[in-house]
């Protein structure tokens, strides 16, 4: 029906051969709106008793463009579909189920522009079934060359979502690249493994995702490899695997001999050396190195000097550290170490005052969804708080918190903290209830508290 109407509206000079007619038919097929979508639009126009002029007025689409759409001389863009849907008073996405076919041309190959736009919109808005159907159709492509292009389209959308700050929406698309790309040594696959790790790094899936990233580092472009080294290093810091922190700090330093990445490599190197028993002098020298990179690193260096002094047993600097830190926005970074130092010194009243004074900072750490530094600092604080409760003779609450911190540490792969919790529990085991003993045994046997 649509083809006949289109042919009638077109004048031909001279005699039209079948070859010319077939050529015209193929051209029209490229732009022809699929029947189901066309009928849905017509249905709502009839319900509102609209003609094309009224649809143009209500949707904001120029009348000439409406005419080309209805005469199948122009494909329907997603932007125009949204405008038409809105003019009908429908919620966005109401007609998306009919748009899937518009993402493919007459040869049933994915149209680059429309498929990318539709895939992005569906992924961003959470239309899982729709984008799953689109991806499945794109992966059914028999031509290896075109299928490779389709995977590039999917990867492009994943990167746009990731760069737009909604990496969790991009995760299923990166999984598609990992599972479907035939070239296992391609940059797309390597980048997808890294993006997956970055997205899930704060969950119990992070450790598993990391193991795959380590095998893909050689296939990443330098810019992505720099980022990967940094986040791998940060993840090992979060899990307190200090030798691995040193390992990737050195790799990052070699790849980036100046600038921000260089500064971060030195910073993490200094933090790790403080934990593995290197000399205080060496750690302070490293801090001096990155203090001159920029004003930002100068501020970090000042705080890390105090932290290093405490790490090496010079606990008399704790009050000076607090005075320096208390008015800074990043107070949460040093607060757990100061609190634990007070507990170690049996300055329990000062520790209690610290909790009351900076309750808003402590609450923010606990509630933050930031999956790296604040979570790590919250874990550090909760461990110190459990020790504080035990030293304050609040054994039941203290041992409960120790078991919770041990459980969380084990789930994120922080075995160093896990062991510390179990050792602290053993120290106060005489005050444990049968429920505490049960949780302790479960953690030892299964790695889970319950």
Describe each region flagged by the PLM.
Residues 29, 33, 77, 108-115, ...:
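Generic helix N-cap/helix-start motif at coil->alpha-helix transitions
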Residues 66, 102-107, 123, 137-147, ...:
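Solenoid-like repeat scaffolds
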Residues 121-135, 161-175, 198-213, 237-250, ...:
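Helix-turn-helix repeat elements of alpha-solenoid scaffolds
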Residues 79-95, 427-429:
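DNA major-groove recognition helix of helix-turn-helix/homeodomain DNA-binding modules
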Residues 140-268, 272:
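Mid-protein regulatory/catalytic core that forms ligand/cofactor-binding pockets
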Residues 60-76, 100-104:
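Recognition helix of helix-turn-helix/homeodomain-like DNA-binding domains
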Residues 1, 26-50, 378-450:
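C-terminal non-catalytic interaction modules
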Residues 118, 134, 157, 191, ...:
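Structural register within alpha-helical repeat arrays
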């Amino acid at each position: 029906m649509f083809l006949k109407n289109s042919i009638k509206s077109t004048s031909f000079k001279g005699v039209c051969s079948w070859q010319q007619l077939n050529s015209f038919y193929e051209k029209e097929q490229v732009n022809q709106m699929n029947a189901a979508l066309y009928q849905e639009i017509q249905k709502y126009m009839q319900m509102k008793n609209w003609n094309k002029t009224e649809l143009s007025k209500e949707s904001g689409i120029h009348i000439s463009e409406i005419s080309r759409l209805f005469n199948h001389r122009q494909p329907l863009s997603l932007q125009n579909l949204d405008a038409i849907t809105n003019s009908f008073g429908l919620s966005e996405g109401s007609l998306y189920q009919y748009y899937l076919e518009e993402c493919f041309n007459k040869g049933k190959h994915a149209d680059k522009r429309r498929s990318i736009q539709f895939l992005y919109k569906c992924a961003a808005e959470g239309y899982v079934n729709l984008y799953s159907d689109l991806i499945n159709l794109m992966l059914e492509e028999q031509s290896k060359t075109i299928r490779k292009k389709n995977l590039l389209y999917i990867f492009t959308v994943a990167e746009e979502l990731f760069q737009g700050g909604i990496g969790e929406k991009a995760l299923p698309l990166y999984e598609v690249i990992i599972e479907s790309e035939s070239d296992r040594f391609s940059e797309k696959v390597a980048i997808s493994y890294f993006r997956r790790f970055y997205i899930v790094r704060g969950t119990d899936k992070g450790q598993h995702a990391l193991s795959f990233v380590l095998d893909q580092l050689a296939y990443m472009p330098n810019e992505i490899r720099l980022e990967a080294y940094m986040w791998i290093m940060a993840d090992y810091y979060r899990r307190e695997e200090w030798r691995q922190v040193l390992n990737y700090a050195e790799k990052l330093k070699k790849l980036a001999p100046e600038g921000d990445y260089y500064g971060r490599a030195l910073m993490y190197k200094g933090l790790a050396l403080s934990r593995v028993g290197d000399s205080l002098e060496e750690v302070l020298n490293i801090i001096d190195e990155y203090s001159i990179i920029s004003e930002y690193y100068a501020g970090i260096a000042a705080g890390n000097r105090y932290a290093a002094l405490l790490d090496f047993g010079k606990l008399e600097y704790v009050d000076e550290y607090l005075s320096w830190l208390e008015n800074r926005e990043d107070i949460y970074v040093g607060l757990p170490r100061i609190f634990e130092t007070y507990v170690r010194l049996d300055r329990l009243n000062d520790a209690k005052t610290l909790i009351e004074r900076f309750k808003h900072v402590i609450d923010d750490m606990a509630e933050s969804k930031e999956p790296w530094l604040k979570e790590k600092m919250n874990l550090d604080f909760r461990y110190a708080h459990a020790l504080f409760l035990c030293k304050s003779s609040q054994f039941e609450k203290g041992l409960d918190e120790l078991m919770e911190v041990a459980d969380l540490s084990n789930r994120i792969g922080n075995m160093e903290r896990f062991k510390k919790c179990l050792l602290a529990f053993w120290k106060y085991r005489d005050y444990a209830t049968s429920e505490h003993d049960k949780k302790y045994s479960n953690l030892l046997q299964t790695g889970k508290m319950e």
